[in-house]
Amino acid sequence: VTATSQHHATSSPAEHLDSTTVVSWKAPISFAVVTALLAVLFLTTRHSGDAVFRLSAPRDLIQIPEIVLNGPVTTWTCVVVMTAITVAAAALVRAKRRVPLWVVVIFAVIGLVAFLTWAAAGARTPVIPLPGLLAGALSLSVPLIFGALCGVISERVGVINIAIEGQLLAGAFTSAVVASVIGQQWLGPIVGLFAAAISGVLVAFVLAAFSIKYFVDQVIVGVVLNVLVIGLTSFLFSQVLAPNAALLNSPPRLQRIPIPLLSEIPLIGPMFFRQTLIVYAMYVIIALVYIGLFHTRWGLRLRSVGEHPTAADTVGINVARTRFWNVSLAGAIAGFGGAFFTLGAVGAFNKEMTAGAGFIALAAVIFGQWDPIRATLAALLFGFASNLQNTLSVIGSPVPSEFMLMLPYIVTILAVAGFVGKVRGPAAAGKPYIKA
């Protein structure tokens, strides 16, 4: 539902929209729907207990007192505040003004507090351990972030990478086998990480060869590669890894490395500074991709090829070579991230253990509007939804288990369809370039 301004703005462009700008009612309508759903939930399933939010882990140097919230009072207070925000958002749209992003963030946080309070107040153990919830969310986000960075680079250079799922799975499989064969506590996982990156490059190499050199539809190639990697790894797992699990599928896991002092900061410390080597590498890769894309000659060439390959070719940029090598680089990043499944989380390879993470990463790329920082934040949102499912199950929340299993995917759908709006990707993404 949209409304178009019929008069020119009298204030600054940041506050009001001109006559050609379309104002969207999507935010107020979304706010109203979420508020109504929470109100119905709180009315039909009343929980009269208290909810306890634990802000410090037992090992933290600084202990912060727990926050105890009364269930009914907190939930209905949040509903009232959310209703007020909804009315304010509607007023902004009626006045031909955009709803700021910070308003959306505040609304989401208040809604989350209301839901967590309601869920904990009716649980067997009404304690929400926020340090564990946040640290676990980051851990579950790691492969999503690597996959999202892979997707950003690929699509920015003009190649739609549906094969992120296959690259993650190939990385998980290869890292498990290589680390198991080497066996040493530190050397095995480190070599396994490099092997995972190489396997991601191999999958990306096939994608690049067929889509760039032979002009095969990029989406079709990506889907075929996903099916191929799933089938190949499943076959090798059944025929090779399972009968020889002690030798080929028992990789040593990466150990957590706490950063002195920083790891003791309440909430933030356990989440960011008490992690494994692959997570610290992720921080560096995020920064490098962002700086490289927007502040280096390499990034300028990459983006020009993805936006206007003909113009890039005119000024002397080899379009095919630029696409080929950057798709391969993206595959290395995804393969490296896939190693987290075996070396950082589970500790052994299982069939189809990525469980659609590549497709959620692709959604994070769209949600993040092809920006590495925004895509990372989107992946963190999806990881938080996944870990919230685990946390509520542990505390014995009355939320049905079927809904909890659906929660990460519901958040993905709502984020991409409900809050992104109309976004435009790289102009030449998915279009083969044929040199005249």
Where does each model-flagged region fall?
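Cytosolic-side transmembrane-helix boundaries in multi-pass membrane proteins
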Residues: 1-59, 76-117, 288-289, 307, ...
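Interfacial/capping segments of alpha-helical transmembrane domains
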Residues: 42-62, 99-102, 124-137, 242-251
